[in-house]
Structures are given as structure tokens and as C-alpha cells.
Amino acid sequence: MFTGIVEEVGTIKSINRGQHSAVLTVCAKTVLEGTRIGDSIAVNGICLTVRQLFPDSFAADVMHETLNRSALAQLTVGSAVNLERAMPANGRFGGHIVAGHVDGVGRIANIRKDDTAIWYTIHSDPAILRYVVEKGSITIDGISLTVAAVEPTGFSVSTIPHTVRQTNLNQRHKGDFVNLETDVVGKYIERLLPSETPKQNTLTKEMLLRCGF
């Protein structure tokens, strides 16, 4: 599990693409501390397993499903990526519950400044937007953010300068694709609720008597 608090911005060192998968090598520093092969690191919000460790980088496999569902396929050598190690049991819960399993992608429709705040408007599919609520949490490229406004075709978040400086948001432009993970709590609640309103029971004592019971 992750929290959406980015520890550092890494750089894509290499991408070895196969027919249905890829191997990413990411230059990093902070997230390498204490990391072992088999540990999890979120790369732009996607939980990846470390397969190799180097003095200045790590390598991870990316499966076909992840490539299809995320914006990782848009990465090139030199791309800046947000990195976060899995939260330890005694770690500080600074953001919100982030599984590292992205729901899909969004596209930056607009970026504007409002005094010190920087607003990002993201357009996405209705299947994702149904879980986006005003003042709720959402993960954009691994960053835990609060939804400031919801529209029929997307939503907006308002970020502080510190967040922009400490993440790859300062390198994002209008038209860029980003990974989105909605709040997992909402998805679990939907799954547990009945799929439809139970039908009213029309069986009565009079009906039973008419039928000979």
C-alpha cells in the first residue's frame, strides 16, 4: 500500500519493450535506500516489483495489462516519474489509501494559475469519473490530491507550489496523459451494495388463502 506522497522524482533510464511486456529501468536515489529485490515501488502511481537493483537505479517488469490500462506506454528515456516506496507498518499516513492499481488514464485539458495555486483540469472516461467526488481523494500519477470540482467530462484539482516542485507536475503540459486511481473505499462500497433496489414483496395472507393455503 502507498499513500500518494511522492518521495522523489526519478528518470527513465531505459525501456526494453517485448511483444506483450516491458522492463523499465529508473534512475533514483531516495527510494533505493533499504530497498531489496522483490520490494514494491510506485512509478507514476503504478505498483511495480523491483527485479534488479543497481547503484543508481532499479529495474521492474511491466505486464501487458498494466501497459494497456496506464500511461506508462507514453514514457520515453529521460521522462520524469514520481516514485514512492510501499508504506511500512510504522510509517506516517500522509495522503490517502493508494493501492498502486490504476483505474485508467486521464488527459490534462487545462492548466491555470490562481494566485499561488495551480489548477489542473483532467478529462477522463465516465467509468472512472463515477468514482470521483468533490472534496474526495484521487491519485494522479501517484500524487494524492483533493478533488476541487467535478464536471460532466472531468474534474479539477488545485495544487500548492510545493507539490508541483516536488513532483513531475512541473513538467506536465496540456494534452499529457496521466494515470488515475480513484478512492478504493468507494469501489468497495459499490461492490457490497445491492446491484438493484429489492422488489417489494407482494405476497399477502389473502393471496395465500385464495390459493388454498
Task: State where each predicted segment sits.
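Conserved loop->alpha-helix
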Residues: 1-213
